[in-house]
From Swiss-Prot:
GO biological process: defense response to bacterium; innate immune response
Subcellular location: Secreted
Natural source organism: Pyrrhocoris apterus
Pro residues bias: start-end ranges: 9-20
Keywords linked to the UniProt accession: Antibiotic, Antimicrobial, Glycoprotein, Immunity, Innate immunity, Secreted
Taxonomy, superkingdom: Eukaryota
Residues listed as glycosylation sites in the UniProt record: T11
Function of the protein: Antibacterial peptide. Affects Gram-negative bacteria E.coli 1106, P.aeruginosa, E.coli D22 and E.cloacae and Gram-positive bacteria M.luteus and B.subtilis.
Family note: Belongs to the drosocin family.
Major site of localization recorded for this protein: secreted
Name of the protein: Pyrrhocoricin
PTM entry text: O-linked glycan consists of a Gal-GalNAc disaccharide, O-glycosylation is essential for full biological activity.
GO cellular component: extracellular region
Region of interest (Disordered), ranges: 1-20
Amino acid sequence: VDKGSYLPRPTPPRPIYNRN
């Protein structure tokens, strides 16, 4: 779920939402 990558998920703070 890339659309939910910017959401507070139980994952490390990586710039997933910052990728073009």
